[in-house]
């Protein structure tokens, strides 16, 4: 091989190696740039405190644990059928509505549900089960998740694998029959930095929990092609994926779940 050809070949190889190094190590650079929310204890991740009206009416705020409920129901049951908004404290939940069988009262009505006796909204001795203002309420039940597939982040559970392996079988409806969303399309979303590998979005693992309407058109407007504005800073501000992946679904410090080619 001529000398100039060898030199050119070596330069091409070196350049490719440098580009690849930047590409796979980009996660470290990104982690340093973005202010990822501080991790909560596993037993608190996914727990929220609802206080739209409670304090105003002399009651303690309501604590709600997503991980306690998602073992039994998929997200669409509450966020489609029961009409809970995705954003905390924006749903007009009232005690009167609960007693009429709406919102929490759809299940918590003092009757048996899936073989379990549910507490209702007329027994005043039960109020503190929800109205306790304590984000860590119910943590004594966290040990019930011990046998589920592990994940390093969030509450330490890989919920998608738990469903795939049949370890949990959450109900996908309360009374309505959901439309079957047999969508197995995986999207490849280019990152805003050259050094960050693309994000991979699998529809199938999301439709196992959600309806299409949970994301479209409010969170992701397909017609407006909002993924063009799909940058990490907006996700961390609670937009797009950040609606769920900041407080309930696996958190954003789990870089490899979305950017599988990254090395963190």
Each language-model region and where it sits:
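Inter-heme linker and motif-flanking segments adjacent to c-type heme-binding CXXCH motifs
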Residues: 56-67, 73-148, 180-184, 188-264
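N-terminal export/targeting leaders of redox proteins
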Residues: 1-60, 71, 120-197, 208, ...
């Amino acid at each position: 091989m001529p000398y100039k050809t060898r030199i050119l070949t070596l330069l091409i190889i070196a350049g490719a190696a440098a580009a690849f190094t930047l590409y796979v190590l980009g996660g470290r650079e990104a982690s340093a740039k973005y202010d990822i929310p501080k991790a909560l204890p596993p037993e608190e991740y996914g727990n929220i405190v609802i206080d739209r009206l409670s304090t105003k009416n002399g009651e303690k705020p309501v604590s709600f644990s997503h991980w306690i409920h998602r073992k039994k129901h998929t997200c669409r049951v509450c966020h489609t059928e029961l009409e809970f908004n995705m954003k905390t404290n924006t749903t007009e939940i009232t005690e009167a509505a609960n007693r009429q069988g709406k919102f929490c009262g759809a299940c918590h009505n003092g009757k048996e549900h899936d073989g379990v006796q549910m507490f209702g909204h007329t027994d005043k001795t039960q109020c503190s089960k929800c109205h306790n203002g304590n984000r860590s309420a119910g943590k004594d039940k966290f040990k019930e998740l011990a046998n589920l597939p592990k994940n390093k982040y969030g509450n330490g559970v890989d919920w998608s694998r738990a469903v795939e392996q049949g370890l949990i079988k959450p109900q996908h409806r309360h009374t309505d029959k959901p439309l079957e969303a047999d969508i197995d399309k995986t999207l490849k979303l280019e990152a805003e930095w050259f050094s960050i590998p693309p994000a991979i979005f699998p529809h199938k693992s999301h439709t196992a929990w959600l309806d299409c309407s949970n994301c479209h058109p409010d969170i992701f407007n397909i017609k407006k092609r909002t993924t063009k504005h799909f940058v990490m800073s907006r996700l961390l501000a609670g937009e797009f994926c950040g609606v769920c992946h900041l407080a309930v679904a696996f958190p954003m410090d789990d870089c490899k779940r979305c950017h599988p080619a990254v090395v963190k």
